[in-house]
Each structure stands twice: as structure tokens, then as C-alpha cells.
């Protein structure tokens, strides 16, 4: 089980990303638009730099929904390999069978 502080910090980052998503998208489109003058583009870059650091989506860490484990995360299921193995062995995931050959 991951530390609760790490899990909560990641939840706060997710909330910040959602809050600033529209503003960030607008500033990025302005900054990358080559038809605009260089001064406007530079000003958009400065405003983008003023946004909170944790408002950047790359700062979010994928974590297991059950344990909070940050590694071996399966995106399709939203859980880690440890939780997948545990749920699979208990028959809680439909269609998942132990392989044998």
C-alpha cells in the first residue's frame, strides 16, 4: 500500500489539471500559432509559465485504484499487477483465467 500522502498529492494534481485545462490549452494554442506576432506568442509562453507547476498533465502519476501502487499499472483496468493477480485468483475479473499449457 502506497503512502496516503502520495495518493492524496496525486489526487490534488488531477484536480489542478482539470481546473487549468482550458486555460492551458488556450495559451498553448496561442504560443504555438506561427501566424501570430512573436511578441504575442512570447507573452503567452510567459503566462503559461505562471500557471501552477502541478497543473501540467505530465506531473500526474498513474496509480492503482485499490492499493495506490505507482508501478506495474494496467491502464485498461486501472489497477496494478499485484491487484490484478489477487482479483484474478479470486475469480473477480470475468474472462480472466490462469494460463496453462
Curated annotation (Swiss-Prot):
Q: Does the keyword Translocase apply?
A: no
Q: Name one GO biological process term.
A: translation
Could you name the domain of life of the organism this protein comes from?
Bacteria
Q: Which keywords, in A-to-Z order, does the entry hold? A: Ribonucleoprotein, Ribosomal protein, RNA-binding, rRNA-binding
Q: Could you tell me which InterPro entries the record lists for this protein? A: Ribosomal_uS14 (IPR001209), Ribosomal_uS14_bac/plastid (IPR023036), Ribosomal_uS14_CS (IPR018271)
Q: Which family does it belong to?
A: Belongs to the universal ribosomal protein uS14 family.
Q: What does this protein do?
A: Binds 16S rRNA, required for the assembly of 30S particles and may also be responsible for determining the conformation of the 16S rRNA at the A site.
Name by which UniProt lists this protein: Small ribosomal subunit protein uS14
Biological source species: Methylobacterium sp. (strain 4-46)
**Top-level taxonomy:** Bacteria, Pseudomonadati, Pseudomonadota, Alphaproteobacteria, Hyphomicrobiales
